[in-house]
Amino acid sequence: VTLLLSKLLKEKSPDIFNAALALRRKTDVLPKIKKEKIFCWHESFFMTKIYCGTYIGEQIFPGWYYLYDLRKNPEDILSLNINNLKEEISKSKKWVRTLKANRSPIIMDKKYSMLDEEYKEIGYSEINKRYKLIEKHREELSHKLRIIDEEKFKDKLDFDQENKLARSEEHTSEL
């Protein structure tokens, strides 16, 4: 069944088939997303959704990368300080996406963004304009996002340690 399905995919959608094979090794992911200025990828959570964006930087976890969803106008977020950026990140309609290299992502040409009504409405011209703005401020934005993630991770570790200590004290008092 798998072999027949792959043959069918190769015949009907060779672009997708080749893109699926291209990033099977996680070491190939970073060079690809750095090389492609604007690209599409998909994410699935109950339904599959296409994204069009660009690479921002590496996250605090190895093999995890920040991607910027170009649906969001970067002018709205680039001037924000870290606290306001934290707030903005927590809102729905996430514009910062995480790409995990060990998930064999499928990176496609930006032309596939036009299959989505929002991107079609924005248009290539505006998408390119937004990309150029992100490219210009990539390092600064990546740095701010890493600081936010480091704080979150530290808070989580502190919380976990406090819980372990509380459970340990509970257990000791029961003895």
Regions found by a protein language model. Name each.
Residues 20-45:
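Short, surface-exposed recognition loops and adjoining beta-strand edges that mediate ligand/DNA contacts
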